[in-house]
Amino acid sequence: MYYAVSQARVNAAPATMLRPQRPGDVQLGASLYELVGYRQPPISSSSSTSSSSTASLLPKPAREKPEAPLAEPRGPAPESGGARADAKEEQQQQQLRRKINSRERKRMQDLNLAMDALREVILPYSAAHCQGAPGRKLSKIATLLLARNYILLLGSSLQELRRALGDGAGPAAPRLLLAGLPLLAAAPGSVLLAPGAVGPPETLRPTKYLSLALDEPPCGQFALPAGGAGSPGLCSCAVCKFPHLVPAGLGLAAVQAQFSK
């Protein structure tokens, strides 16, 4: 009998907690709610009860989530003084690059013109050019090497001339006609400076100038009409082709003395 009454009280306990009927049950239910920290929602409606209970169970940051403010549209920013200075500096750099490129282009054009002029002088003495294709242009390195060899050849010819003039062979010695034109080696021991040295390759024949040097008399000098005893002379020999001025103090003896030093 006692067990049946106790079981009935246990089964009726939840009902008294949810819906009190007696004052004792109300105090017991209130004290139980205070112990567990649970607040009973007001019994107004089922929807308000469910929403309030859900809101009470959610954490505080989730309940108070602020909305992000809308971004305001930004218009075109006005140009500042720094932007203008940067644009001006960039324009100046572009102008400087154009000037540098123009100067470099001009330098390369001048270099190509100078190399072409050097090729015109070197090609008649280039054996590789005579054997190869005539329309093929020598490279810059090959042209400079040929010019170096040509200069060394002229130096050796001058050494031979010094030795020949130092021996003192008399009037039949080779003559050095100073006309300010390219040097042409006629034979070992004889170097001629003749105005006809610049011409087509077929006209550059050493034997031609050697025969002229042996057959013709020495260069004659006669004073100019308006000149005096110390005035320069006028040479009109067959080797010289056309009259040109020869200083009065620069005869064959003076040339021999200059090269014998």
Swiss-Prot record:
Xref: PROSITE patterns: BHLH
InterPro entries: bHLH_dom, bHLH_transcription_factors, HLH_DNA-bd_sf, Olig1_bHLH
UniProt induction comment: By SHH.
A GO molecular-function annotation: E-box binding
Residue numbers spanned by region Disordered: 41-105
UniProt-listed Pfam families: HLH
Entry superkingdom: Eukaryota
Domain bHLH: 95-154
Compartments it resides in: Nucleus
Biological processes per GO annotation: axon development; neuron fate commitment; oligodendrocyte development; positive regulation of transcription by RNA polymerase II; sensory organ development
SMART domains: HLH
ATP-binding among keywords: no
GO cellular component: nucleus
Keyword annotations from UniProtKB, A to Z: Developmental protein, DNA-binding, Nucleus, Transcription, Transcription regulation
Presence of keyword Cell inner membrane: no
Biased composition (Low complexity): 44-56
Coiled-coil stretches: none
Tissue specificity remark: Expressed specifically in the brain, including the corpus callosum, hippocampal and cerebral white matter. Also detected in cells scattered in gray matter, most probably in oligodendrocytes.
Function as written in the Swiss-Prot or TrEMBL entry: Promotes formation and maturation of oligodendrocytes, especially within the brain. Cooperates with OLIG2 to establish the pMN domain of the embryonic neural tube.
UniProt xrefs under PANTHER family: BASIC HELIX-LOOP-HELIX PROTEIN NEUROGENIN-RELATED, OLIGODENDROCYTE TRANSCRIPTION FACTOR 1
Protein name: Oligodendrocyte transcription factor 1
Organism: Rattus norvegicus
Lineage: Eukaryota, Metazoa, Chordata, Craniata, Vertebrata
